[in-house]
Amino acid sequence: MEFYLSSDCASLARYVSKVVYLEDNDIAHIYDGELHIHCSKIGSEDFLFRTVQKLELELSKIKKGPYDNFMQKEIYEQCETTKNVMRGRVDAFTNRVVLGGLENWLTELRRAKRIIMIASKSSFHSCLAARPIFEELMEVPVNVELALDFVDRNCCIFRNDVCIFVSRSGETTDTINALNYCIKKEAVTIGVVNCSGSSISRFTHCGVHTNTGPEKGIATTKSYTSQYIALVMIALWMSEDLVSKIERRKEIIQALTIVPSQIKEVLELEPLIIELCDKKLKQHDTFLLLGRGYQFASALEGASKMKEISYVHSESILTDELGHRVLAVASDNPPIIAFATKDAFSPKIASCIDQIIERKGNPIIICNKGHKIWEQDKQKGNVVTLEVPQTVDCLQGILNVIPLQLISYWLAIKKDIGVDLPRDSAMSAPDI
């Protein structure tokens, strides 16, 4: 009998159909074709029993197929992965969200006096993107914490807090440390992960599985949008008993159902983005990304992707912070990418973009289809627009981040960078 060892079950899919997950303090002893599991704790000498589980991964999902690399494949899979995270959970006919993984903790979750979302890297950005809708629908304080900083500060956690832990792999060390800290404080914990057998999914009280499938590229793409939707669904589910939010919830649920088809429309921008990267962007090594409200999280995620994949310096800035010496940089003509889709902040964002144009900047504007406000500037060559479909404000960031994923990808391709294995990544390399 052969045994394979791995930190990620996806890498074993081509070799095995069954797996055993080890837990903390487990020691696996393989000898003479047999597996024995012991506990490393002093005084524990008995063998441990761990359940053998079926590995539910399709080999086709961890191959590139017709795509050049995994990152490109995973960007295009977002039409399907956003459907998968909602399948069986979002009912557009009754305007309800059903989350079976949380049902047993319904009473405790709806009694929450504070919600804390804890994550790292891109998962942290998805929490920032979802925070405003939690605050609006739940009407309780909502904190978003970087997992490492959260543990370092020994944050105050109480029994009536609900702590949501978001991780692509479910094995992020800093996030697991934060989870253990919150469990000791007796807070209710929710896991939002892609891997159902992961540490976070096993140790949290309840959770939501994003059903994203394996993400082989180092850069988080489809997991970000799936986490975003999963968090919005949690906010909708937890606020179901608030009568004052019924109409707002209906609006969001109806918008959720058409997000996958709208993503398909956004992906049609790829030829324009390829041309933009080739003619205007690839010679630059500094980028500024502007966003406000829901779109500040989009700016953060876009800047992170450009650093990670394209090896360029990119900075995300709140649009109204332009006056704090940022406009001085704009006159040096670094590419400026501004999120200007329609929401409560549109007039102020338009004013900031006008200031950039006055200083001879040539911003790239991500706006909604049919938004004619920059038509004259576009004809004069002062701006470039990337038009995306319009949706409800709290979901617009899902559509807005995809052009940034494509820009990061094609900048890297133009520079002959291996997008699936970027240098100096803090994450483990996938089995490609």
From Swiss-Prot:
Record keywords: Repeat
UniProt-listed CDD domains: SIS_GlmS_GlmD_1, SIS_GlmS_GlmD_2
GO biological processes: fructose 6-phosphate metabolic process; protein N-linked glycosylation; UDP-N-acetylglucosamine metabolic process
InterPro entries: GlmS/AgaS_SIS, GlmS/FrlB_SIS, SIS_dom, SIS_dom_sf
Pfam (any one): SIS
Domain SIS: 105-244, 277-422
Name of the protein: Uncharacterized protein EC1118_1M3_2531g
Record organism: Saccharomyces cerevisiae (strain Lalvin EC1118 / Prise de mousse) (Baker's yeast)
